[in-house]
Regions:
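Conserved beta-strand-loop surface patch within small alpha/beta domains used
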Residues: 1-113, 122-215
Length: 215
């Protein structure tokens, strides 16, 4: 089954490249990939949680074509819940896709699924034949990407379709960009890997109150 969500691509003249960025690796000319810092940080927290088990997630954002330049802006990540085991590895099931669609509407309106994450702590950030097969089945757009992660050795890499669309290849690099990104902040509070939202809110409130004896 092919899953589609609204807002698959945009061509907007008013779009501007992120200004505050950190380059990771080389520059990928075929597709400029920008991942927001809150997303990047959250994915590492998510990957390390639960005893370092294998995890999947969806990447959400927008795709742009501007003056011949193809740009992928990744502004959010959604945990993959209700995954299924296929051939000894985790995969999105029908329940997973339904959950992602609901979270997309709740937290990331106007965005679409632009790729997915496969985190296998301690196994590197390599592309496997099973990952490529899954990607080609469910992520058919030539701008949809796979982000492979190893949170133990802190290794990661993006994979994208090659020029003729016959398979995936490793991206030469990507950019981490910095933004206020309220959508991802809200998602992180409700899906914290560190502490529940209520506890985080209590700590934040306490920090804002004046200390006894303070002038």
């Amino acid at each position: 089954m092919q899953y589609q969500f609204d807002g698959e691509r945009e061509r907007r003249a008013e779009f501007a490249m992120p200004k505050r960025t950190k380059q990771m690796g080389g520059i990928e000319q075929r597709l400029r990939i920008f991942v927001e810092d809150y997303v990047y940080t959250y994915l590492y927290q998510y990957g390390k949680s639960g005893g370092g088990a294998e995890k999947l997630a969806a990447l959400v954002g927008k795709y742009y074509e501007l003056e011949g330049q193809r740009v992928l802006l990744i502004s959010g990540a959604i945990q993959a819940k209700g995954t299924v085991q296929e051939g000894g590895t985790e995969r999105f099931g029908d329940e997973t896709w339904e959950y992602i669609g609901g979270q997309l509407q709740q937290y990331f309106k106007g965005m679409t699924v632009v790729g997915w994450v496969h985190c296998q702590p301690g196994f590197g950030a390599f592309l496997t034949a099973k990952d490529e097969q899954f990607h080609r089945e469910y992520f058919k757009e030539d701008w949809q990407v796979l982000f492979a992660m190893d949170t133990v050795d802190r290794l990661d890499s993006f994979y994208l379709y090659n020029e003729d669309g016959s398979g995936l290849r490793q991206a030469r690099g990507y950019f981490v960009y910095y933004d206020r990104n309220r959508e991802m902040q809200e998602y992180m509070l409700d899906n914290s890997m560190i502490r529940p939202r209520e506890e985080a809110a209590e700590i934040e409130t306490a920090a804002e109150q004046p200390k006894e004896g303070a002038k």
